[in-house]
Amino acid sequence: ENFAGGCTPGYQRTADGRCKATF
């Protein structure tokens, strides 16, 4: 599922708009 930012599940959107792994 896509949330704000369109990151893959398990990833969080950072302040600069990129996707970072949360694990």
Swiss-Prot record:
This is Paralytic peptide 1. One of its GO terms (molecular function) is cytokine activity. Keywords: Cytokine, Disulfide bond. Causes rapid, rigid paralysis when injected into Lepidopteran larvae. The physiological role may be to reduce hemolymph loss following injury and promote wound healing. It comes from Spodoptera exigua. GO terms for cellular component: extracellular space. Belongs to the GBP/PSP1/paralytic peptide family. Hemolymph. The keyword Ribosomal protein does not apply. Disulfide bonds join 7-19. The keyword Cell cycle does not apply.
